[in-house]
């Protein structure tokens, strides 16, 4: 789908003033407080998982616009500082809001997917993203379908990139996932199916084989 047809960036859920702020940041970043923009985007991402899936694309566009206009990175710095702050408080976030936690993981993985330095993923985000995924692979998280679903979706999205950046941690993560699949913890049938699917997805080189696609998607639809 072309960029022009997607320029709304799913910001309809913001109030009119904030929508205008974001639109200005995309077109004329020097005219707005970019640290405020970063905080607005993170705040909304923690509350709205639909937006958190889109936010990386918007952040990338603002970073590109600011770099082109002024050769600066005020927005990126503000965004990364706020991500670090939320990362440091992730255990409290998970304890008080499961939805906020899932939205945060979705958001940081989305940012990792979109932000590039010299056409490479940002090294500064590799370990924080891994740490979040490791938490999702703990037994108490695997007993919650929302966390299993988040884990599998994010590995589909950024697993291959993460493995290229640090293969040892990916091996360790999948040991946890396999243990969760095999050990007698309280896994729902859907969670067990999702874990098996991601194990086979990685084993096939981060690709879904036609047979696997047919099997898993028929199972989920049933």
UniProtKB/Swiss-Prot annotation:
Its annotated compartments are: Cytoplasm; Nucleus
Q: Which UniProt keywords apply?
A: Cytoplasm, Nucleus, Translation regulation
> Nucleus as a keyword?
yes
Oligomeric and partner information: Interacts with EIF4G1, EIF4G2 and SLBP; probably tethered by SLBP to the 3'-end of mRNAs ending with the histone stem-loop, it also interacts with EIF4G1 which is bound to their 5'-end.
Q: Name one GO molecular function term.
A: identical protein binding
Main localization of the protein?
Answer: cytoplasm
Q: Which gene encodes it?
A: Mif4gd
What does the similarity note say? Belongs to the MIF4GD family.
Record's protein name: MIF4G domain-containing protein
Q: Which GO BP terms apply?
A: cap-dependent translational initiation; regulation of translational initiation
Q: Which Gene3D superfamilies match?
A: 1.25.40.180
What is the protein's species of origin?
Rattus norvegicus (Rat)
Chain's role:
Functions in replication-dependent translation of histone mRNAs which differ from other eukaryotic mRNAs in that they do not end with a poly-A tail but a stem-loop. May participate in circularizing those mRNAs specifically enhancing their translation.
Locate the MIF4G domain: which residues? 3-205
Q: Which GO terms describe its cellular component?
A: cytosol; Golgi apparatus; histone mRNA stem-loop binding complex; nucleolus
């Amino acid at each position: 789908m072309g960029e022009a047809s997607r320029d709304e960036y799913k910001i309809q859920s913001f109030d009119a003033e904030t929508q205008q702020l974001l639109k200005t940041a995309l077109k004329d970043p020097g005219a707005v407080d970019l640290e405020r923009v970063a905080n607005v985007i993170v705040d909304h991402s923690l509350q709205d998982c639909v937006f958190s899936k889109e936010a990386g694309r918007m952040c990338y566009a603002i970073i590109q616009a600011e770099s082109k206009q002024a050769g600066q990175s005020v927005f990126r710095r503000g965004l990364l500082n706020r991500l670090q702050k939320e990362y440091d408080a992730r255990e409290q976030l998970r304890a008080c809001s499961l939805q906020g936690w899932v939205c945060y993981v979705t958001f940081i993985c989305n940012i990792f997917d979109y932000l590039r330095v010299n056409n490479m993923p940002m090294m500064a985000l590799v370990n924080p993203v891994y740490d979040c995924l490791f938490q999702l692979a703990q037994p108490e998280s695997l007993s919650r379908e929302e966390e299993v679903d988040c884990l599998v979706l994010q590995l589909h999205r950024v697993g291959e990139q993460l493995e290229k950046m640090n293969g040892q941690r990916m091996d360790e993560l999948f040991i946890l996932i396999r243990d969760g699949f095999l050990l007698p913890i309280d896994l729902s049938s859907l969670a067990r199916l999702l874990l098996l699917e991601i194990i086979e997805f990685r084993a096939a080189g981060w690709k879904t084989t036609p047979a696997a696609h047919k099997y898993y998607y028929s199972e989920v639809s049933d």
